[in-house]
């Protein structure tokens, strides 16, 4: 499948991309959106979430640097997007890092239906109630079957799941693809992952 047609559509439509991002990646996310032809807005204030989300072509929710206001903003933006059939992408960064973060992300998922969820193996395990071992936002667990985690999470959430790792996985609950989306493991990483 080629990505040239969707990219051409984005460039022609120049959609507003509403990103509730973390402070670590906000600049990168904005620049990436600009590079593909979207128009990013990195609004954070809960008071304007419904208005901004209603104008967006897509909404991205990242929980990397959470606080109560960001979770309130994410719930409002996501619910508004759902009501208007605007796709929502959720990146539940570090979902297993603390009980508070896990509870807030579970609450978010009760109120917002994402089209896509991007996770690592530890985050997927946490969302599936399997514990998941994380060090900050990095997955420490190397499950023997990350494909099973991706497929189970896609079925549970009813959306596409992108699971990053040595091999990146895309699952929709019925189909599973393995690819290298972003990661480019070194030979040392490949050797380590087999141990």
Task: Kindly give the residue locations of the regions a language model identified.
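A short helix->loop->beta-strand "cap" motif at the edges of active sites that frequently abuts
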Residues: 80-87, 115, 159
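Single conserved hydrophobic/aromatic residue that forms the stacking wall/gate
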Residues: 182-195
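Conserved phosphate/ATP/ADP-binding segment of small-molecule kinases
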Residues: 99-176
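Glycine-rich phosphate/adenosyl-contacting loop at the front of the ribokinase-like
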Residues: 1-42
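Active-site cofactor/substrate anionic-group-binding motifs, chiefly glycine-
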Residues: 37-80
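Glycine/charged-rich beta-loop-alpha catalytic/anionic-binding loops adjacent to active sites
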Residues: 11-16, 173-184
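Anion (oxyanion) recognition and catalysis
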Residues: 34, 82, 155
